[in-house]
A protein has these predicted regions:
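Sec-dependent N-terminal signal peptides
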Residues: 4-13
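Extracellular/lumenal and peripheral-membrane lipid-interaction modules
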Residues: 16-186
């Protein structure tokens, strides 16, 4: 019984910490979107805030077929990991999938997506550097299919390997191992 109580208390503390990190991340995002972030300031999103956002908010974006999502960061690089069932994700969007393709993408698999970010002067370029499914790198036509079928339907205006203008008065975005810094224009 004591173990159960200790486990329940530990889970409550972890969920409370996650909720606090999520609330902090959402407040920072709100200040960017509403234009209340101080000019010249740097809004810093800790890795804990980013992963808390992913844990709580991704299910609202992708309601089925994804779990255990997490982000790791490096200098100007980032990787997202999740267990994904690509067929469930397609079905959740109401998309039909032909029999052959459904057999290829059915079932939960570990997926890692890695990016490199260049940012400055109010612009950004996000390069897709690697996509791995079950430890196998996706390349060429397979990678194109994955981007067109699963990523672009969620983010139809996304630019991959193309320069785009940052909104919300953002000057640049800096990825670092501890988190992401968002510099606001002066």
């Amino acid at each position: 019984m004591h173990r159960f109580v200790a486990l329940a208390l530990l889970c409550t503390q972890v969920l409370t910490a996650g909720d606090a990190a999520l609330r902090s991340a959402l407040a920072k995002l709100d200040s960017l979107e509403n234009g209340t972030a101080k000019r010249g300031s740097i809004i810093f999103f800790s890795l804990q805030e980013i992963n808390s956002w992913a844990l709580y908010m991704v299910p609202g974006i992708v309601p089925q077929g994804i779990r255990n999502q997490r982000v790791t960061l490096g200098t100007d690089t980032g990787s997202g990991y999740a267990l994904m069932d690509l067929l469930k994700m397609r079905h959740a969007e109401g998309k039909a999938t032909n029999w052959m393709m459904s057999r290829l993408i059915e079932g939960e698999r570990p997926v890692t997506v890695s990016i490199h970010v260049q940012s400055g002067d109010g612009h950004c370029i996000v390069d897709l550097t690697r996509v791995e499914i079950s430890g196998v790198a996706a390349k060429g036509a397979v990678l194109d299919f994955l981007v067109k079928t699963f990523f672009l339907p969620l983010y139809p205006t996304a630019k991959i390997s193309e320069r785009f203008e940052l909104s919300y008065n953002i000057e640049r975005i800096d990825l670092r191992p501890a988190g992401i810094g968002v510099k606001i224009k002066k």
